[in-house]
Amino acid sequence: MESLGRKVKEDGVVIDEKILKVDGFLNHQIDAKLMNDVGKTFYESFKDAGITKILTIEASGIAPAIMASFHFDVPCLFAKKAKPSTLKDGFYSTDIHSFTKNKTSTVIVSEEFLGADDKVLIIDDFLANGDASLGLNDIVKQANATTVGVGIVVEKSFQNGRQRLEDAGLYVSSLCKVASLKGNKVTLLGEA
């Protein structure tokens, strides 16, 4: 996705050789037009897969996931990092480690919203080590639902996330692949 790649290169801030900050358009302030294009691109990639639910994790995955759900015309469901007082029982849970925050959280999804008939597209903002997507896939499995694929907005191709997801049998579609953050510069896959 060319417009996303341009945005990542122009507005992304390299924190170090493994961390890219995209707060200006994805993780804090959201570029709605770009997220609409992201959602539409995910739709084009998975439109024939019979998707019934989009699943993400709060908070940064919500913007691209909601736009994808708009284009698919299916509900968007997000795993919560804290159990709300309104949810007494009947939920799936798993532990997910955040690469960026270096913190493990137990996330939950209500059984009310995810079931065996669902065909799920997992969407996340970043792919680093793959822990978030693997955790969400675990929740899908607990529901006896089917993960059709994983849609990633920005993949850090120099980390092992894609390999871990593919080793788990998951199809991965990434819209922007970052090859390197060396020299305080974003280099996309395929660039010299």
Curated annotation (Swiss-Prot):
<dbReference type="InterPro" id="IPR010079">
    <property type="entry name" value="Xanthine_PRibTrfase"/>
</dbReference>
<dbReference type="GO" id="GO:0005737">
    <property type="term" value="C:cytoplasm"/>
</dbReference>
<dbReference type="GO" id="GO:0032265">
    <property type="term" value="P:XMP salvage"/>
</dbReference>
<dbReference type="InterPro" id="IPR000836">
    <property type="entry name" value="PRibTrfase_dom"/>
</dbReference>
<feature type="binding site">
    <location>
        <position position="27"/>
    </location>
    <ligand>
        <name>xanthine</name>
    </ligand>
</feature>
<feature type="binding site">
    <location>
        <position position="156"/>
    </location>
    <ligand>
        <name>xanthine</name>
    </ligand>
</feature>
<feature type="binding site">
    <location>
        <begin position="128"/>
        <end position="132"/>
    </location>
    <ligand>
        <name>5-phospho-alpha-D-ribose 1-diphosphate</name>
    </ligand>
</feature>
<feature type="binding site">
    <location>
        <position position="20"/>
    </location>
    <ligand>
        <name>xanthine</name>
    </ligand>
</feature>
<comment type="function">
    <text>Converts the preformed base xanthine, a product of nucleic acid breakdown, to xanthosine 5'-monophosphate (XMP), so it can be reused for RNA or DNA synthesis.</text>
</comment>
<comment type="subunit">
    <text>Homodimer.</text>
</comment>
<keyword id="KW-0328">Glycosyltransferase</keyword>
<dbReference type="GO" id="GO:0000310">
    <property type="term" value="F:xanthine phosphoribosyltransferase activity"/>
</dbReference>
<protein>
    <recommendedName>
        <fullName>Xanthine phosphoribosyltransferase</fullName>
        <ecNumber>2.4.2.22</ecNumber>
    </recommendedName>
</protein>
<dbReference type="GO" id="GO:0006166">
    <property type="term" value="P:purine ribonucleoside salvage"/>
</dbReference>
<comment type="pathway">
    <text>Purine metabolism; XMP biosynthesis via salvage pathway; XMP from xanthine: step 1/1.</text>
</comment>
<keyword id="KW-0963">Cytoplasm</keyword>
<dbReference type="GO" id="GO:0046110">
    <property type="term" value="P:xanthine metabolic process"/>
</dbReference>
<keyword id="KW-0808">Transferase</keyword>
<dbReference type="InterPro" id="IPR050118">
    <property type="entry name" value="Pur/Pyrimidine_PRTase"/>
</dbReference>
<dbReference type="InterPro" id="IPR029057">
    <property type="entry name" value="PRTase-like"/>
</dbReference>
<comment type="similarity">
    <text>Belongs to the purine/pyrimidine phosphoribosyltransferase family. Xpt subfamily.</text>
</comment>
<keyword id="KW-0660">Purine salvage</keyword>
